[in-house]
Design a protein with these regions (language model features):
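Cleft-lining beta-strand/loop regions that shape enzyme active-site pockets
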Residues: 1-162
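Metal-dependent DNA phosphodiester-chemistry modules and their immediately adjacent helices/loops
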Residues: 127, 177-182
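Short acidic, Pro/Gly- and aromatic-enriched capping/linker segments at domain boundaries
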Residues: 163, 168-172
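Conserved functional hotspot residues or short segments at active or partner-binding sites
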Residues: 181-236
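A short, sequence-level motif marking secondary-structure junctions
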Residues: 12-17, 174, 189-190
């Protein structure tokens, strides 16, 4: 304490979940939906995502909810590799240096999952997560649901100084496929959710996930309706 006396306090031990990728299957009415949460972008994440998507494909899920809430980023290369799982020969992100020169990153031809999807984002969605979210939104691959993202889109280089300190110098910025600068602006979702988030993301009490289920089910219902209309016209 401030007066120098020693005091004993009890600390509650809690397990820390270090799994960067979590997945489960949800049922919404007549639809089977996959839930896929990424907590950070580490080196192992792209491989884990591919494995998770293949497992969900085997379970015949019709659509996927991708949860990027409170994912503050990590390895940008990992986020780009995950975007590659969902996008077929599409622009993922552009980098623009201080001279205005742009460099583009395009996804490969093969995708691991090509069904309908929605993506949950919030103010804690940053950096590599925003690159992924922006790529999905701008390519009309996934609607974004939730709140405006953080807005971290700078590429910085650390320059050492003579006193053993350093200074971060901005060398480039990230742009979404539509040319939107992420830095300081973030990404605005297609559908805003203005109510409180659950303490445990992905739990049965998570109203954001429930809203994503409803949104995705409406897409799947329209898809079924269109297929039925095609079948009727074929018979005619």
């Amino acid at each position: 304490s401030m007066d120098g006396d020693l005091k004993e306090i009890d600390l509650e031990r809690r397990s820390v979940d270090l799994r960067p990728v979590r997945t489960k299957r949800l049922r919404d009415g007549s639809h089977t939906i996959g839930y896929l949460r990424i907590t950070q972008f580490s080196e192992s994440v792209p491989r884990k995502i591919e494995e998770a998507l293949e497992e969900l494909n085997e379970k015949e899920v019709e659509g996927i909810i991708l949860d990027l809430r409170n994912n503050s980023g990590g390895l940008v290369s990992s986020g780009i590799a995950v975007a590659d799982c969902f996008l077929n020969k599409k622009l993922i992100v552009e980098t623009k240096n201080r001279e205005g020169i742009k460099d583009s990153i395009i996804s490969e031809e093969d995708t691991t999952f090509n069904g309908p999807m929605v993506t949950l984002v919030n103010s804690g969605t940053a950096s590599a997560s925003e690159i992924l979210a922006g790529a999905l939104q701008d390519n009309n691959r996934s609607a974004l649901i939730g709140k405006q993202t953080y807005g971290k889109g700078l590429i910085q280089s650390l320059k050492s100084l003579t006193d053993d300190s350093g200074i971060a110098i901005t060398v480039a910025s990230y742009l979404t496929p539509n040319g939107n600068n992420i830095q300081g602006r973030g990404i605005i979702p297609d559908k805003i959710l203005d109510f409180n988030e659950a303490k445990d993301f992905g739990s049965s009490e998570d109203k954001w996930v429930k809203n994503a289920e409803i949104y995705l089910s409406s897409i799947l219902d329209k898809k079924e309706l269109q297929n039925n209309e095609i079948k009727i016209s074929d018979k005619a």
